[in-house]
């Protein structure tokens, strides 16, 4: 079974991916973790590697390659904003493709708590990051991140919370 889970920062993708991984005994592969690993492999901080990635599309291509390679083995949760799109562009069809969404202020509060940051600073950083990623995804992949047409399930996580979202996905799997 292959499940993709995407969503903007603060929607709960990592929380839900971990819960599903534990429940169904699936590997959890996260594009963000791949990015962090690549930063370490290149002896760079996350910020240095982020700056490098903005100027070098090869970074995105390598993240994509690693995601596709992991998906070939099956039995995994593939988490990342573009996970569903990457598989689609590689003619791979997941068993279930999920997009989590949440109100921007809910996401901002979640991020500020997770990162131990002031809410205003977290909001500013979140909006800058999202604008940058939206532009990059359009330029590199010709993907509109707001196009949710490829997803089997779109869930409002600020309405349901982690347990509610998990229960909805469980019903979809059955």
Swiss-Prot record:
Key word tRNA processing present: no
Catalyzed reactions: CMP + ATP = CDP + ADP; dCMP + ATP = dCDP + ADP
One GO term describing the cellular component: cytoplasm
Any single GO BP term: pyrimidine nucleotide metabolic process
UniProt EC number: 2.7.4.25
Broad class of enzyme this protein falls into: transferase
Signal peptide: none
Protein keywords: ATP-binding, Cytoplasm, Kinase, Nucleotide-binding, Transferase
GO molecular function: ATP binding; CMP kinase activity; dCMP kinase activity
Record-given protein name: Cytidylate kinase
Residues bound to ATP: 7-15
Subcellular location: Cytoplasm
Family annotation (InterPro entries): Cyt_kin_arch (IPR011892), Cytidylate_kinase_dom (IPR011994), P-loop_NTPase (IPR027417)
Family to which this protein belongs: Belongs to the cytidylate kinase family. Type 2 subfamily.
Superkingdom of origin: Archaea
HAMAP family: Cytidyl_kinase_type2 (MF_00239)
A family per Pfam: Cytidylate_kin2
Organism encoding this protein: Methanococcus vannielii (strain ATCC 35089 / DSM 1224 / JCM 13029 / OCM 148 / SB)
